[in-house]
Design a protein with these regions (language model features):
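CheY-like receiver
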Residues: 44-45, 52-131
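Single conserved hydrophobic/aromatic residue that forms the stacking wall/gate
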Residues: 138-146
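Conserved acidic carboxylate
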Residues: 10
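Non-catalytic signal-transmission and effector/linker regions of two-component phosphorelay proteins
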Residues: 1-5
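Charged phosphotransfer/docking patches of two-component systems
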Residues: 13-17
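Acidic, metal-coordinating helix/loop segments flanking the phosphotransfer/catalytic sites
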Residues: 20, 35-54
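A generic structural motif
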Residues: 27-33, 77
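Alpha-helical interaction/dimerization surfaces of two-component signaling modules
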Residues: 22-26
Length: 146
């Protein structure tokens, strides 16, 4: 199985480190990166690096809000917003985030989010594999008809 790659974009270094430690304690086999805490630097990073499967994204960054980052970088990651502000929740779900964590983040709540990600990922893989088998069966049947 491939190692899950997760990234954190947070402009407050202590908060980024704490979230990193919390994720690693819950999923020590994951590769967790702390990315630059600005929109500009993070957009540049996304343009030249493979996107992580899961992105923990603070809404308020030093140079704007993270919705700008999403518009510019277009990450193909599943997104979890982390913020001290609850007024962005509706907008966060409008951009297909899988969760919205209010700071301070509690370990139990983070675990629920990680389990939601794992559940969604497993469902995607099951659906993809099912569709692949259907395509293979269809292709095989078509070849047999010739």
């Amino acid at each position: 199985m491939n190692k899950i790659k997760a990234a954190i974009i947070e402009d407050e270094v202590p908060a980024a480190r704490l979230l990193h430690e919390m994720i690693q304690s819950l999923r020590p086999d994951w590769e967790v990166m702390i990315l630059p805490g600005t929109i500009e630097e993070s957009v540049e990073w996304f343009h030249v690096n493979p996107h992580p499967e899961l992105l923990f994204l603070d809404i308020q960054l030093t140079d704007g809000n993270s919705f700008m980052l999403i518009e510019q970088a277009r990450p193909d990651s599943m997104i979890v917003f982390t913020t001290a502000y609850d007024e962005y929740a509706v907008r966060a779900f409008a951009v297909n985030s899988i969760d919205y964590l209010l700071k301070p983040i509690h370990q139990e709540r983070l675990l629920q989010t990680i389990e939601r990600f794992e559940s969604l990922t497993e469902k995607y893989i099951r659906d993809f594999n099912r569709e692949s088998r259907i395509c293979l069966l269809y292709t095989s049947d078509a070849a047999d008809d010739k």
